[in-house]
């Protein structure tokens, strides 16, 4: 059964299905264009996230879509339950606690509907009291959303390719 967001009652979160891939790919393409228009030219390059990665996430049951009341997909994200390997080493800061957490990755919207972040966060909080996320230093919109929704900037992490991200935690 889809999870209805309390913050955005007209949005629902459900597990992504392989048939959702075309809509998800279009959402990520729109998000990349929006990032570029806002000066964020270094994040999500070379077609990231790829359809292959999205299918891997779908099969692992960690990919979700935000839908409108009529079932239209308006956003997508990955929710990792358990330890995020790149969060094992945090630089220039510390995590507020060592409690179990979920991690929001690859949150994207096509821009048609507001409240995607709130729907995603509501869903994540239904899985864990502690939520972590990270973003690129040039992704000012995501940084703003995180802070506005109570996330604390905790430090810097490095991805497998050694690119730097700002790490946040709520709870």
Located regions from the model:
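Conserved acyl-donor/pantetheine-binding loop and adjacent beta-alpha core of acyl/acetyltransferases
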Residues: 78-112
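Conserved acetyl-CoA-binding loop-helix of GNAT-fold acetyltransferases
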Residues: 112-126, 144-148
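Conserved GNAT acetyl-CoA-binding A-motif
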Residues: 126-138
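Conserved active-site alpha-helix within GNAT-family acetyltransferase domains
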Residues: 138-155, 160
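C-terminal "cap" of GNAT-fold acetyltransferases
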Residues: 159-171
């Amino acid at each position: 059964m889809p999870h209805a967001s309390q913050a955005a009652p007209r949005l629902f979160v459900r597990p992504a299905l392989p048939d959702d891939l075309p809509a998800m790919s279009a959402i990520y393409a729109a998000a990349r264009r929006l990032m570029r228009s806002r000066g964020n030219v270094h994040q999500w390059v070379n077609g990231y996230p790829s359809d292959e990665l999205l299918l891997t996430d779908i099969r692992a049951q960690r990919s979700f879509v935000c839908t409108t009341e009529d079932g239209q997909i308006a956003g997508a994200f990955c929710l990792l339950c358990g330890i995020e390997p790149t969060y094992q080493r945090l630089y220039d800061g510390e995590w507020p606690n060592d409690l179990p957490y979920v991690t929001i990755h690859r949150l994207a919207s096509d821009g048609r509907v507001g409240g995607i972040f709130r729907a995603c966060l509501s869903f994540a909080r239904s899985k864990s009291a502690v939520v972590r996320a990270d973003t690129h230093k040039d992704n000012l919109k995501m940084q703003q959303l995180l802070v506005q929704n109570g996330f604390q900037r905790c430090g810097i992490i490095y991805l497998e390719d050694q690119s730097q991200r700002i790490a946040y935690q709520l709870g």
